[in-house]
Amino acid sequence: MKHFSKGDKDMAFTGKATYSAGANLPELAEDVADLIGIVSPYETPLLDALGDPLREATSTHHEWLEDELLPNKDAVNDSTFTDPDIDTQFVVDNGSRFRVGDQIQIEGSRELMLVMGVNGNSLTVSRGYGGTLPESLADNQVINILGNAALEGDDKPGIRFTNRSRRGNYTQIFTATVEVSGTDIAASHLGLADEMDYQKQERLRELIRDLENTVINGGQPSASPQGGDTARRTMKGVVQHLATNVFRTGDSDFPTGADLDEAKINYALRKIWASSNGNVDLIVVGGFQKRKINSFLSASRSYAGSDTKFTDMVNVYESDFGVCRIVTTRWLPQDTVLLLDSSRIAVLPLAGRSFYFKPLASSGDYECGELIGEYTVELKNEAAHGIIRGLSVS
């Protein structure tokens, strides 16, 4: 048996190694993963939640009709009462909403009144109707019109109706060019089989990402919205459509504080429910507000001794005014929450203009083409949706 001395054991290795030919390892075969990682976000959660449309737009100006029932609310518009406890005449905002025989009631009051006469915006009423006790009237009080009582054998009442309104939005063209040299197409690549196909996929991801961003935040020019030689035609996004149910932190009656909490969500849902037949089923938020929604359960969360999984996530919010799926998107402003009725929203392609690739003639040693898509947003009955703005983001 050979024995080594202490000096033999300390001898450095001097033979051939993987690094002998240089730091770039020129003698070794490359080991490159045959997959390409994409770090940029391209998910479109709102488009996924809305789903594919059942129809297409057939014009660059897509239109739809909206209607509403005759209103059953109004307000007192009179500050000159002689005795607000017994006066039988007062002025309202819209006298045309009332008919003789209407039972009416001031919101928050138990007194019933019967309309005896309507003259322009002036009402004559019978106070304390049905054995109720008269209560004080005041300017700006909301009046609920309960319903009309007709006389037996009476002639038909005057005709009343609503006019349908036409709403619309313009289509917007989304494009991207793909161009690859003949040599690049012929060469062998890591992670892909065809450079042209790969470039199409990447540009398509970008266009769909931009479509969702525009569906949420896009705006429409006040001049030449139909487009022109130098005017680009753009769609109006969801945020820009909303005007009725816009809630901001600091508004009167809106729950105090800048942080998102259940009180603010429920206030907005209740207001939308009270003023429309909208069925809000989507709550759309950014990442920061999603964490705020998750915290709604912090105080009531509990775990059994056998639980080994910690869950801190809310995907569905069930309220008295609807069951809402929580959708988290990167493209919504972080201080904003959208409350949407998905049955009234559609993202429509112009007929034959869903995203597609159009090969273009090549004038050299390359292949080229263009990805094209033309879309618009149909948002019906904007009063059936809502938005909360100005929330804290830190």
Identify the function of each model-found stretch:
Residues 17-27, 110, 123-182:
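Cys-His-centered catalytic/binding microenvironment captured across papain-like cysteine peptidases
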